UniProtKB/Swiss-Prot annotation:
Positions of region (Disordered): 1-27
Name this polypeptide is given: Small ribosomal subunit protein bS18
InterPro entries named in the record: Ribosomal_bS18, Ribosomal_bS18_CS, Ribosomal_bS18_sf
Cellular component GO terms held in the UniProt record: cytosolic small ribosomal subunit
Protein family: Belongs to the bacterial ribosomal protein bS18 family.
The organism of origin for this protein: Salinispora tropica (strain ATCC BAA-916 / DSM 44818 / JCM 13857 / NBRC 105044 / CNB-440)
Domain of life: Bacteria
Organism ancestry: Bacteria, Bacillati, Actinomycetota, Actinomycetes, Micromonosporales
Entry keyword annotation includes Ion transport: no
Keywords, in A-Z order: Ribonucleoprotein, Ribosomal protein, RNA-binding, rRNA-binding
Amino acid sequence: MAPSARNRKPGARSMAKAAALRKPKKKVNPLDKDGITYIDYKDTALLRKFISDRGKIRARRVTGVTSQQQRQIARAVKNAREMALLPYTATAR
């Protein structure tokens, strides 16, 4: 018996097997849900939903948007930062 299998309870699966068998939950696209078709750089309330607490743009897999929408969000966030509507980084603690 392998050392890791010896410590395992009977009938228990390894974490890797359990993760492989689990079906990933489908992300709901927040822009489609709200009916937003155009992402404006002046809409800072919307853009803040796609920025982390550290000021980074969140990934597609986290937000659930399409690749085209992700590019539009990135462009809008960068424009808003340039126009001083959004900070480049988060405030220091």
